[in-house]
């Protein structure tokens, strides 16, 4: 019975009680610690104020008091009255003028907002940060508004989570506190079985003493701790997720610890020789390949490995030696470089997925041409790269076998296949030591410059092109190949292009007419070696494939741009017809690609991406609140400004819209079926343009380089100083509720 009771105390119920008690204790300690910090800071600030006050008092005592000139009469001053100051003491009577200020109209109410020059995508707010104050009259009319608002956030309000809130700091402290219970129970179990396991315990103690220097940290907490925390806080993750989170948080607390993906500075003393993918990890993670910015806030998605490959060579080798000691003068060097080039531009063979290319046995005869060797090295390396997730052990085994083959001189003479081994009568390769920084930089550059070893040597700066070439030969079985784009179709003929172009223009018109109200956000498709059929996400969303998609450039669903030679401001332009701006990478004849003179561009359909906005002035409106006015005259259909703000989801827009409706002020603008632009908190000055049923501007959602953006254009010719209006597309009831004053129509 005693043993049964003892086991029950260690069950899940007991651990849940421990989690709750330790959690409340840590929360209380944190509140006490916070209160002590506030008291200490208050006393410190008060002491500083007293010291500063004492210094100022000493300075005032040393200064001479300047007498104030007292006016004897104020009757001659217009708009002033005479006021006298008397005292019950023996001070003389003082007469001062009192000037009355004229009444000034107050400025309209404006809520704080942050200026933006481009859209800013934000995540959904699942917690209500504050309960908005609407005034007593709003609560009297609709007493259930606050309750319904909280229900929209699933009852989660900021600050109202005493029993369910656990941050990273409390989580680590909670696990460490519960680990003491686990250690105590382990000690009790060890005492019960001390007679039976004395030898094993002594052996473990000896092992712990030996590993004390290499493993100074204590053992990892038990799984039952994370299981109990997961049961008490189910929204924080499962057992495995909590274990991984605890491991990451504790590793970050170690002095000098680096993230697992982080590599030492390539220019620092601790530079290491790593693979290309590891060196470029930060670049691939932070660099946006759609807007060419680091840490982009408009496209918060992670690129796939297929987007890392290059489709063209950065600097082609001209074939001329760079000097008397150039690598091209070595025997077999040109053949090796030509083999690399031929293999890079060659279409890779299509092998069944999930199967590896087996290595030929040692007794199998193989051709000894450099091309075949490079092909095998690249294929094997490609398998190694693909097998890092599934078959790392077999890759290491193959690499060791290759090293054995290279080190064996007898096998090298009979089965040598690299050009460096095909020249027995020339001098042996130089034995040059490569530092970690140089090796890492070489692996980064080889993916861009390929076989141009002269250019790579100039960029490295510390090695000759011959040394770079010899290092490339040694690295031929390690460097991952850069696979070129797989093109299954031959180049189109000119007549066929014209026919496809006409069919494409008709397809644009059909899409515009049939699904004008169904516009979805664009995401680049990525299905290697698969055509853009009904399973393609671009086709499903009824979007064209853009230049960011990983499909072939000959894809039938890809938008090819226009070939206009005019201003691209009529429906004769395919881009204008498809409600798109001309792409400077696709539209090469209309002037959209002319970037030298941005003010005199012949194409008039690229204003949003170039930021060719007009000068706007902010002033009180004649209709409601603030208004926006134009400084310079504009012509009809001319671009005025882009409507910028936060890009939020439709669900988030519904939650925010309930609050904006009560304020009777909304800056929400539908972007597409997936997202909405909200200029309430962040935006630009065009957010102050008011609504009118007879506007002088109009808004148009356009596709600009793969992004939907809102442009404000002139509906008619607008003169200097006119206030800008556009139609909010309110319903009749909403228009009466939001806008009670309509601007006066100007009679020409």
UniProtKB/Swiss-Prot annotation:
GO biological process terms on file: methylation; negative regulation of gene expression, epigenetic; rhythmic process
CDD domains associated with the record: SANT, SET_EZH2
Domain SET residues, every copy: 614-729
E.C. code: 2.1.1.356
Intrachain S-S bonds: none
InterPro entries according to UniProt: CXC_dom, EZH1/2-like, EZH1/2_MCSS, EZH1/EZH2, EZH2_SET, PRC2_HTH_1, Pre-SET_CXC, SANT/Myb
Start-end of Polar residues biased regions: 362-372
Domain CXC residue range list: 505-607
Subcellular compartments: Nucleus
Subunit organization: Component of the prc2/eed-ezh2 complex.
Family statement: Belongs to the class V-like SAM-binding methyltransferase superfamily. Histone-lysine methyltransferase family. EZ subfamily.
Protein name: Histone-lysine N-methyltransferase EZH2
């Amino acid at each position: 019975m005693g043993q049964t009771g003892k086991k029950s105390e260690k069950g899940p119920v007991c651990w849940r009680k421990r989690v709750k008690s330790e959690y409340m204790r840590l929360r209380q300690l944190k509140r006490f610690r916070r209160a002590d910090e506030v008291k200490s800071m208050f006393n410190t600030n008060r002491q500083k104020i007293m010291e500063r006050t004492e210094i100022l008092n000493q300075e005032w005592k040393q200064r001479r008091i300047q007498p104030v000139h007292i006016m004897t009469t104020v009757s001659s001053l217009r708009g002033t009255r005479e006021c006298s100051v008397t005292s019950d003491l023996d001070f003389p009577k003082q007469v001062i003028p009192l000037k009355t200020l004229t009444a000034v109209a107050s400025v309209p109410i404006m809520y704080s907002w942050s200026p933006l020059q481009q859209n800013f995508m934000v995540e959904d707010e699942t917690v209500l940060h504050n309960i908005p104050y609407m005034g007593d009259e709003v609560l009297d009319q609709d007493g259930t508004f606050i309750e319904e608002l909280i229900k929209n956030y699933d009852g989660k309000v900021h600050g109202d989570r005493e029993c369910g809130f656990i941050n990273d700091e409390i989580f680590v402290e909670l696990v460490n506190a519960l680990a003491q219970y686990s250690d105590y129970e382990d000690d009790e179990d060890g005492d019960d079985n001390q007679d039976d396991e004395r030898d094993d315990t002594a052996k473990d103690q000896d092992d712990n003493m030996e590993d004390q220097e290499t493993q100074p940290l204590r053992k990892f907490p038990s799984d039952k701790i994370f299981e109990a925390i997961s049961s008490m806080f189910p929204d924080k993750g499962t057992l495995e997720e909590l274990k991984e989170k605890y491991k990451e948080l504790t590793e970050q607390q170690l002095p000098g610890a680096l993230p697992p993906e982080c590599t030492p500075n390539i220019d620092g003393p601790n530079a290491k020789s790593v693979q290309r993918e590891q060196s470029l990890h930060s670049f691939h993670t932070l660099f946006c390949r759609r807007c060419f910015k680091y840490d982009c806030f408009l496209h918060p998605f992670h690129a796939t490995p297929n987007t890392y490959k290059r489709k063209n060579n950065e600097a082609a080798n001209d074939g001329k030696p760079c000097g008397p000691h150039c690598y091209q003068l070595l025997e077999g060097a040109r053949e090796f470089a030509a083999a690399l080039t031929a293999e890079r531009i060659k279409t890779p063979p299509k092998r069944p997925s999930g199967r590896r290319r087996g290595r030929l046995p040692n007794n199998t005869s193989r051709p000894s041409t450099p091309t075949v060797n490079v092909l095998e090295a690249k294929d094997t390396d490609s398998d190694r790269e693909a097998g890092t997730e599934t078959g790392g052990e077999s890759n290491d085994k193959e690499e060791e076998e290759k090293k054995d083959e290279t080190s064996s001189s007898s096998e090298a003479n009979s089965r040598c296949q690299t050009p460096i081994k095909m020249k027995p009568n020339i001098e042996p390769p130089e034995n040059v030591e490569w530092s970690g920084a140089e090796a890492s930089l070489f692996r980064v550059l080889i993916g861009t410059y390929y076989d141009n070893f002269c250019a790579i040597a100039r960029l490295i700066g510390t090695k000759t092109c011959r040394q770079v070439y010899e290092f490339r030969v040694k690295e031929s079985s390690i460097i991952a190949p850069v696979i070129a784009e797989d093109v299954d179709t031959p180049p189109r003929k000119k007549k066929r292009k014209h026919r496809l172009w006409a069919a494409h223009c008709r397809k644009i018109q059909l899409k515009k007419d049939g699904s004008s109200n169904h516009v979805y956000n664009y995401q680049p498709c990525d299905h290697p070696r698969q055509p853009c059929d009904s399973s393609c996400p671009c086709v499903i969303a009824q979007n064209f494939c853009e230049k960011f998609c990983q499909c072939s450039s000959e894809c039938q669903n890809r938008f090819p741009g226009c070939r206009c030679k005019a201003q691209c401001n009529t429906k004769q332009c395919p881009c204008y017809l498809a409600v798109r701006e001309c792409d400077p990478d696709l539209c090469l004849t209309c002037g959209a690609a002319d970037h030298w003179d941005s003010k005199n561009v012949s194409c008039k359909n690229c204003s949003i991406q170039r930021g060719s906005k007009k000068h706007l002035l902010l002033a009180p409106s004649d209709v409601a609140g603030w208004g926006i006015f134009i400084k310079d005259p504009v012509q009809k259909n001319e671009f005025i400004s882009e409507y910028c703000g936060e890009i939020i989801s439709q669900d988030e827009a519904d939650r925010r819209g309930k609050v904006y409706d009560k304020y009777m002020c909304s800056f929400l603008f539908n972007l597409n079926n997936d997202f909405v632009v909200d200029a309430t908190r962040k935006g630009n000055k065009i957010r102050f343009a008011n609504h009118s049923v007879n506007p002088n501007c109009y808004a148009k959602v356009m596709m600009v380089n793969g992004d939907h953006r809102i442009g404000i254009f002139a509906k008619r010719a607008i003169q200097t100083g006119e206030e800008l209006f556009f139609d909010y597309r309110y319903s009749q009831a909403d228009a009466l509720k939001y806008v009670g004053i309509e601007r006066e129509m100007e009679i020409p």
